[in-house]
């Protein structure tokens, strides 16, 4: 990375719209630390230029002819793993495709403000530049195992949940144990390595705070639910926190738990520059669950969640940080480790078992 400090970040722009290629190039090159070394009109052209130009970062449109963004990403990760920032639409189809791409190994995404050809793309300039710079410093991780999992039927989930409630008598009561997972850049891929490996009868509730804008967290929750034995969905105000269920904070809202054990959503100011913020959820749940809370911090930029993890460790709770060896961006977990707030530091593929073990003790 030392040479990247001295030279601009080399970016390849892949989009089937000539207008969007021009706009993205202008926006990126408005920053002196970025240079666009090439553009491609579709996925096949993009793949050839990745191999030819060997860029530091690729921006990749989701919807393209010949070879779409997802297919192109799969080939890039197989043939020359490169940090990729997806450029997607706000449509349901665009969100679903984006989540699949993030699960496969894309570093991050930028949503087009107004459809596939966005005349106002300039409003996303700062986000685009920041995410390309972050991607240049990221480590591309080829994620395949969770993506290939067979979907789990709703009937299997209901049977497992009914069995859990018979065994524990939880019903709608507050679960004895709670797991809070926080993540940012690279988080969707990490979550696809963890959530599908949790048992349907996990004797704990699970809350997930992923830094992500509105419109995409629902697709993330739906995709995880399809692949997982445990039930997963986007949290709604008033939802009870239950054992055997994963609730994902909706983009644009802080997620809290009220005195009755129900989800409360808050659009107060961003904390650490993000909303939802992991530390806001920590402040809400730590006084209730105390040492019965399990905190997990995964890949991501910044330090959100570190304060909550330090308080949880002090309270006697179990804390897990993702190891640098599997992080896309070793930021949030690094701060947790440096604070001495992690009881375990584990590669992502070991975290589901660690969670299951932690909530099964006491």
Curated annotation (Swiss-Prot):
Record text about domains:
Contains a C-terminal catalytic domain, and an N-terminal region which modulates catalytic activity.
Report domain CheB-type methylesterase positions.
173-362
Q: State which Enzyme Commission number(s) the record gives.
A: 3.1.1.61, 3.5.1.44
On modification after translation, the UniProt record reads: Phosphorylated by CheA. Phosphorylation of the N-terminal regulatory domain activates the methylesterase activity.
- Tell me the Gene3D superfamilies matching this sequence: 3.40.50.2300, Methylesterase CheB, C-terminal domain (3.40.50.180)
Keyword list, A-Z: Chemotaxis, Cytoplasm, Hydrolase, Phosphoprotein
| SMART domains in UniProt | REC
Question: What cellular-component terms does GO give this entry?
Answer: cytoplasm
Question: Of which family is this protein a member?
Answer: Belongs to the CheB family.
Which GO terms of the molecular function aspect are on file?
A: phosphorelay response regulator activity; protein-glutamate methylesterase activity; protein-glutamine glutaminase activity
Modification 4-aspartylphosphate occurs at: 61
Q: Which Pfam families match?
A: CheB_methylest, Response_reg
Tell me the ranges covered by the Response regulatory domain, including all copies.
Answer: 10-127
Q: Which SUPFAM superfamilies match?
A: CheY-like, Methylesterase CheB, C-terminal domain
**Entry's Gene Ontology BP terms:** chemotaxis
Q: Which InterPro entries match?
A: CheB-like, CheB_C, CheY-like_superfamily, Sig_transdc_resp-reg_Me-estase, Sig_transdc_resp-reg_receiver
- Active site positions: 184, 211, 304
Instruction: Quote the catalytic activity from the record.
Output: [protein]-L-glutamate 5-O-methyl ester + H2O = L-glutamyl-[protein] + methanol + H(+); L-glutaminyl-[protein] + H2O = L-glutamyl-[protein] + NH4(+)
Where in the cell? Cytoplasm
Report the protein name in the record. Protein-glutamate methylesterase/protein-glutamine glutaminase
Quote the HAMAP family the UniProt record gives.
CheB_chemtxs
Query: According to its UniProt entry, what is the function of this protein?
Result: Involved in chemotaxis. Part of a chemotaxis signal transduction system that modulates chemotaxis in response to various stimuli. Catalyzes the demethylation of specific methylglutamate residues introduced into the chemoreceptors (methyl-accepting chemotaxis proteins or MCP) by CheR. Also mediates the irreversible deamidation of specific glutamine residues to glutamic acid.
């Amino acid at each position: 990375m030392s040479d990247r400090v001295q030279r601009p970040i080399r970016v390849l722009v892949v989009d089937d719209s000539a207008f969007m290629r021009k706009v993205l190039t202008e926006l990126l090159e408005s920053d002196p630390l970025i240079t666009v070394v090439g553009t491609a009109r579709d996925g096949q052209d993009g793949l050839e230029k990745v191999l030819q130009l060997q860029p530091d970062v690729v921006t990749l449109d989701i919807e393209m002819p010949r070879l779409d963004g997802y297919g192109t990403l799969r080939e890039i990760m197989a043939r020359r793993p490169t940090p990729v920032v997806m450029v997607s639409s706000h449509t349901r189809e665009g969100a679903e495709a984006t989540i699949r791409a993030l699960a496969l190994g894309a570093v991050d995404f930028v949503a087009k403000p107004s459809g596939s050809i966005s005349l106002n793309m300039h409003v996303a300039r700062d986000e685009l530049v920041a995410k390309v710079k972050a991607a240049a410093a990221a480590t591309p991780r080829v994620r395949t195992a969770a993506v290939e999992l067979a979907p789990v039927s709703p009937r299997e989930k209901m049977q497992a949940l009914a069995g859990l409630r018979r065994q524990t008598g939880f019903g709608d009561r507050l679960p004895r144990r709670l797991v809070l997972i926080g993540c940012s850049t690279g988080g969707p891929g990490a979550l696809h390595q963890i959530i599908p490996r949790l048992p349907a009868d996990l004797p704990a509730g699970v809350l997930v705070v992923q830094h992500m804008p509105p419109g995409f967290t629902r697709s993330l929750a739906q995709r995880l639910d399809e692949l997982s034995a445990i039930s997963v969905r986007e949290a709604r105000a008033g939802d009870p926190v239950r054992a055997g269920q994963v609730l994902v904070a909706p983009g644009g809202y802080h997620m809290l738990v009220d005195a009755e054990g129900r989800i409360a959503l808050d659009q107060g100011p961003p904390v650490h520059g993000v909303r939802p913020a992991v530390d806001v959820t920590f402040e809400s749940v730590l006084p209730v669950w105390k040492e019965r809370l399990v905190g997990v911090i995964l890949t991501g930029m910044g330090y959100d969640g570190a304060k909550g993890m330090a308080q949880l460790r002090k309270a006697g709770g179990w804390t897990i940080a993702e190891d640098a060896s599997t992080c896309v961006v070793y930021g949030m977990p690094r701060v947790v480790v440096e604070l001495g707030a992690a009881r375990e530091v584990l590669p992502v593929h070991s975290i589901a078992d660690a969670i299951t073990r932690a909530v099964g003790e006491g």
